Design a protein with these regions (language model features):
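Walker B catalytic acidic pair
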Residues: 114-115
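Conserved catalytic/switch belt of AAA+ P-loop NTPases
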Residues: 101, 125-142
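Short glycine-rich substrate-engagement loop in P-loop NTPases that contacts/grips substrate
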Residues: 83-103
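Single conserved hydrophobic/aromatic residue that forms the stacking wall/gate
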Residues: 160-163, 167-168
Length: 168
């Protein structure tokens, strides 16, 4: 069955060391983990296919693993929303309800919102209070190819990391 996996998925980086061409981002994220200075909200922006979502997933897996050797221990604390196809107010309301519940094991629940620019304005507005004042046990990671389409009020409180194209 492995022979039928799309190359992009099969070769997706699983650690920061495997990410190609985003040294400043991976360095920043590794330092944040090492010093336990994690922002509660991150916005990754940049062109399609440069590693934004991969970096988000790697970070999400490592956040709760600081004391654990097994990277699968806390994978149930990671939630991913593809905003390209789940961009309604109802989708966001579900997240708003879920974030109130702290993780049963581990310190954080991590929400990755991929293609964040695809959220409707109504969905962004429904999400705004949660994004501006997330519970202490929540980390949000938004990834977008079109930062200019993300509501201007959101990036103010976010740590913004720009990914760039790499020529190999």
């Amino acid at each position: 069955m492995d022979q039928f996996i799309v190359s992009a998925l099969k070769n997706r980086p699983k650690s920061f060391e495997e990410v190609i061409g985003q040294d400043s981002i991976t360095h920043t994220l590794k330092n944040s983990l090492k010093t336990n200075q994690l922002p509660q909200a991150l916005l990754f922006s940049g062109p399609r296919g440069v590693g934004k979502t991969s970096c988000a997933r790697i970070l999400a897996k490592q956040i709760n693993n600081l004391e654990s050797k097994n990277s699968e221990d806390f994978s149930f604390n990671i939630f991913e929303l593809d905003a390209a196809s789940n961009n309604s107010v109802e989708d966001i309301r579900k997240i708003n309800e879920q974030v109130r519940i702290p993780p049963q094991i581990g310190k954080y629940k991590v929400y990755i919102i991929d293609e964040a620019h695809m959220l409707s304005n109504y969905a962004f507005n429904a999400f705004l209070k949660t994004l501006e004042e997330p519970p202490k046990h929540i980390i949000f990671i938004l990834a977008t190819t079109e930062k200019n389409k993300v509501l201007p009020t959101i990036p103010v409180s976010y740590t913004h990391l720009r990914a760039h194209e790499t020529v190999l």
